[in-house]
Amino acid sequence: MKNEQPMTGRESLELISAMIVDTRRRYHFEDGRLHLFWGYLDIAVALLVWGVAYFTQSVWANLLWWLIPVVGIPVSRLLSRKSGSKGYALSYTDRMISSMWRYVGFLSFAFALICLLFSFGGHPQVWMLMFFYSFLVVGMGTAVVGLLLDYRSMLYGGGFSILAGAFVLTATIAESPLLEVWAMPLFIASQAAMFVIPGHLIYADTRRRAENKTAGDA
């Protein structure tokens, strides 16, 4: 039995490029829709929380944030099941990105559980922690995916979210009145930057590729 020849530097780069292209193709099949779904869901729930909190002046309005995982997880699974990416073998890049988002999801439940426990202890204001999670953790995850797949819209969107999170965190520490004015608008803007804008760009690129393929087959 012959020993396998080690890969050259060029072959390694070609393999990595092929995995990235293959993962990008899967993003064009399903993640355009998933990005749009999560982005618009987050924005809708944020507006709902904002409105309820404004009219009731109650911090318990933050419990409405649970609508995001309660609605989002089953619907996103349904969208993934219906996606056209079935039948493709998962590459290392796919598994790495999937594992990263699972870890991000685990952190969201861990953070939410901490907030819930402190809320029952009479400190409902701790739900602000979920803002920092969304800005910083999700922003970092989005930026990493943008770097891995060379999606500049996701890289810039994640970067915007991280910077917005740094502003909100600083305003919280400084007890600045800017927090009440800018926290929710920045959250909504960050969701649009991370999910809605990249989702529309990916969806438009998918349609353009499909039209070019149809024209080429004709």
Residue ranges of model-derived segments:
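Terminal transmembrane helical module of multi-pass membrane proteins
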Residues: 142-218
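Helix-coil boundary and interhelical linker segments in multi-pass alpha-helical membrane proteins
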Residues: 50-61, 115-128, 171-182
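N-terminal juxtamembrane cytosolic/stromal segments of multi-pass membrane proteins
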Residues: 1-32
